Amino acid sequence: MFRILIKKYLHESILLWCALALVLFFFPWVRIWTVSQFELTGFAPLIEQFKAFEKFAPVPLEQFLTYHGIIGITYDEPVVLLCVLTWCIARGTDVVSGELNRGTMEMLLAQPVKRSMVLASHALVTIAGLGLLCLLIFAGLYLGIHTNSTPVASASKLTLPWLEWTINNPFTPKQMQNVPLNQLVKPQEFIAATMNLFSLGFAVLGLGVMASSFDQYRWRSIGIVISIYVLSLLLFILSKSTPSMGIFKPLTFLSAYQPAWMIQQIHNHPERQWYLSNAQHAKSWQETIGPMGYVSILMLLGLAAYSVAFWRFTKRDLPAPN
């Protein structure tokens, strides 16, 4: 029966997954191609105009003048977040309240199947789908880095006679040379950020399943999860507005989604990629947690929400179909 439930949830979600997979694979690739058409140092005057907004950025704005920094923004792009959240909210809220709303839950539970098996099979399909979507994002980044080159300004060299010193020639203008991106950026620097995106999706998915397990109407479950996310986003923005508002930062789970900061840390210190704690190198309270620490926080939130959902669904009395 477990295999039949797996097939049922695969059939229900395959079209949505394929549509999102198409976007999440090609968007990073196209974005990297677009970025690679420009020499980044030319954007320095533009970046200076946004210095007043630097407090809202997860890293110093100068980071966006580096190729690993500008590519890392992919994980904060609205398109990427919208696709991942669409999968998590749409599929998470469907498992209980969706079936009740459609009047199909009674028919499903009339079969020789435990309630926990319904949630477990749905979780397996949905979490696997989320993992594959995140892998496709990384695959798009990997191919974008390995199939594109970018113009880089390089000065001609001048060798001083007798001294055998080589210096930049001040009498000739800098020349533009196309350099493969894979010589400037290492794809493995984005592994932790990809895991952070997966953990964010898992946390939202857990919240969706938990809301669904308590409710009868899917539209209300969707509204609850979106409200929680928007409230967390507002608290996150508020916490960055002024130092006195920093007290709100621990109150939002979005504080644990830090892909740009992770990429910066890993680029400068590759050995810290798998750190749970970064306290010995921390310059602020945010840096006391390592990349895997942030991933673990979101994963624990998702597991806690799933645990509540399993408990509630196995204990509740199901309402009669409308």
Question: Can you describe what each PLM-predicted range is?
Answer:
Residues E12-S13, V30-I71, I167-M176, S221-S227, ...:
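Terminal transmembrane helical anchor/hairpin motif
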Residues I89-L109, A123:
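Transmembrane helix boundary and interhelical loop/hinge segments in multi-pass membrane proteins
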